[in-house]
């Protein structure tokens, strides 16, 4: 079993139970199955069904065959659609936005993306193409793999889908820029595309931070030279209806250098952004951080409040932390998500990682390489009040897993990002309840020793101011396993058996 798959597992768990027995469904003649080809159909934070899109066994070398299946919340088949395409058209990822299912394809002959939308009866609603000629090669085939999948689609409920990629102005080492496209649900609605100014000479990357009723919030990370470790963050706000830029402001601070990690979009149109802060002149990709920051941002993109929680002064009240942000006997934390509950408490969900120094030295001597031996361990939840003062840190035990990565010359932040993009972490999701009074954290872990088939999925539930956790262990001969949202009290497990060319879906009851 390959470690890159498990970080892409995603499941939602809810606390009430509505069925005492698990349901099952089997899909046969499956040539290729991807985690992003299956997803939950969710209404009002409740799973009402599933879509499953996969490649069927080929009938000839020039044609690919696909099938889209729609299932209800009990895995009962509702509808399906089979279709064929030329060999040059490859499925990359699928997404659901509360109304439609979008499937993204890459046409290698024309070097373009093709987006097709389907309703919940598996009937095609629309189609759109976008040029992929200038897309960075690391992005161009993103998702076209059974491993290490990542997403370029962001669903926007009631509106459409956001597609975001990095493009090159010239060759492979030329300046890069972000391109963001809104593809609306309706053919009558007008989509839009936003790109960086053609005059920009920066090297840019980007990521969608959040969406509310008014704006898309996008993080632009810029550097002036290709190999520079001096990054600058900009918060871009785009009007969802028009695609026009509302603001594009640098995330700056008079006291510190900062690096943005995450954001929370508030219903009124404003945002809260979170990240790490450093010494003022530090190069954020390499330096050790001083702690976490929380800033409030208004509807014009201006920072209105600033709060800092340092490792040495604040976090050390709950954990033994060194001044460089390294937790004693633990290492560092990679923060996956920040969430806000109905009572305005803020929770930061992190996962432990560290370098196994002795193992790395032994590996280097043995292989004459600069590889690093890393370990991924426990889950951490930081609890803040509504002013971003740290109130508690909870630690949840998780099995230790080891892996080897190429040598990283940057600091803990760069190493954490590298592990994230490799899919090395066990974290899967954080899901708020409809009233935002409760949330669940999901993770999937298993023994990464070669040949091992033992794995488990775990959950951390927060309700009434308290945490509860659960783990369920399994032994399986499947090639890969994925976990998805389930009806109340359940998760849906998908197991892909490559040799047998089949996918087995089943619902499993949780111990809550």
Enumerate the language-model features and the residues they cover.
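Post-signal peptide N-terminal segment of secreted/secretory-pathway proteins
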Residues: 42-158, 163-170
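Short, conserved, GDST-rich strand-edge loop motifs in beta-rich repeat architectures
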Residues: 49-61, 161-174, 219-230, 276-291, ...
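Conserved blade-ending motifs and adjacent loop-strand segments that build the rim/top face
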Residues: 248-261, 307-332, 390-428, 462-490
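Beta-propeller blade signature
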Residues: 65-73, 115-123, 175-187, 230-245, ...
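Loop/turn-rich, solvent-exposed surfaces of beta-rich toroidal or solenoidal domains
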Residues: 275, 292, 335-355, 369-383, ...
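Structural signature of eukaryotic scaffold interfaces centered on beta-propeller domains
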Residues: 33-47, 92-98, 106-108, 142-159, ...
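Long, internal scaffold/assembly segments composed of regular secondary structure
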Residues: 209-219, 227-351
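Bacterial Sec-dependent N-terminal signal peptides
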Residues: 1-27, 512
């Amino acid at each position: 079993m390959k470690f890159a798959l498990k970080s892409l597992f995603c499941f939602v768990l809810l606390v009430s139970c509505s069925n005492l027995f698990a349901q099952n469904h089997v899909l046969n003649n499956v040539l290729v199955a991807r985690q992003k080809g299956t997803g939950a159909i969710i209404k009002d934070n409740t799973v009402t069904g599933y879509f499953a899109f996969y490649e069927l066994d080929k009938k000839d070398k020039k044609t690919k065959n696909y099938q889209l299946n729609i299932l209800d919340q009990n895995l009962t088949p509702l509808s399906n659609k089979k279709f064929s395409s030329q060999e040059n058209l490859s499925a990359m990822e699928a997404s659901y936005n509360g109304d439609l299912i979008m499937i993204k394809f890459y046409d290698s002959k024309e070097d373009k993306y093709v987006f097709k939308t389907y309703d919940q009866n598996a009937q095609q609603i629309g189609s759109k193409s976008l040029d992929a000629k200038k897309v960075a090669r690391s992005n161009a085939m993103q998702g076209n793999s059974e491993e290490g999948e990542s997403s370029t689609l962001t669903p926007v409920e009631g509106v459409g889908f956001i597609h975001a990629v990095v493009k090159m102005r010239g060759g492979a080492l030329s300046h890069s820029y972000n391109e963001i496209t809104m593809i609306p649900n309706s053919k009558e609605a007008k989509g839009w595309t936003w790109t960086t100014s053609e005059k920009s000479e920066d090297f840019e990357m980007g990521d969608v931070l959040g969406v509310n009723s008014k704006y898309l919030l996008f993080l632009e990370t810029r550097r002036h030279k290709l190999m520079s470790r001096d990054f600058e963050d900009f918060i871009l706000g785009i009007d969802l209806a028009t695609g026009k830029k509302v603001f594009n402001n640098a995330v700056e601070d008079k006291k510190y250098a900062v690096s943005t990690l995450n954001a929370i979009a508030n219903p009124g149109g404003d945002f809260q952004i979170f990240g790490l802060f450093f010494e003022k002149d530090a190069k954020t990709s390499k330096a050790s951080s001083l702690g976490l920051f929380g800033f409030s941002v208004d509807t014009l993109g201006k920072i209105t409040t600033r709060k800092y929680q340092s490792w040495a002064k604040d976090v050390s009240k709950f954990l033994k932390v060194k001044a460089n942000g390294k937790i004693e006997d633990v290492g560092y934390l990679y923060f996956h998500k920040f969430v806000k509950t109905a009572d305005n408490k803020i929770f930061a969900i992190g996962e432990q990682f560290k370098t196994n120094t002795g193992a790395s030295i032994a590996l280097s001597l043995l292989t004459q390489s600069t590889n690093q031996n890393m370990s991924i361990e426990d889950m951490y939840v930081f609890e803040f009040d509504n002013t971003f003062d740290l109130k508690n840190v909870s630690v949840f035990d998780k099995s230790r897993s080891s892996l080897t990565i190429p040598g990283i010359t940057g600091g803990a932040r760069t190493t954490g990002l590298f592990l994230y993009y490799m899919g090395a972490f066990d974290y899967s999701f954080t899901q708020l309840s409809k009233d935002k009074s409760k949330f669940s954290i999901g993770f999937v872990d298993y023994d990464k020793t070669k040949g091992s088939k033992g794995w488990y999925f775990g959950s951390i539930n927060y309700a009434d101011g308290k945490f509860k956790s659960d783990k369920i262990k399994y032994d399986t001969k499947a090639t890969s396993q994925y976990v998805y949202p389930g009806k109340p009290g359940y998760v849906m497990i998908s197991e892909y058996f490559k040799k047998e060319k089949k996918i087995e879906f089943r619902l499993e009851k949780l111990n809550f």
